[in-house]
Amino acid sequence: MCFRLRKQLAEAFGPVNRWFCAQAYGRPVDDPETLLVYFIRSGGAADFAARFDAAMGPLNRWYCSEFHGRDIRDPEILWNYYMNCGAPALSIAG
């Protein structure tokens, strides 16, 4: 299974999506199909795609390479750097 798919499924079946899905259904949800459908329909898949594209993009690749002191092209290293150091902070407009 490719890296991107493993990460996306981990988010779809993870505690955050599971919690939001349970809130939407009013009960705990353990069914993988229900979790996947909720993840897609609620925008989780689109959000993941945008974050993954940014993590693999040239700007993050440059910052990650600078951080490691060498050219980085490995998707897992880029993803980990983006999620830990490069993802923009969420701002809540009031």
Annotate each language-model stretch with its function:
Residues M1-G94:
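Polar low-complexity intrinsically disordered regions
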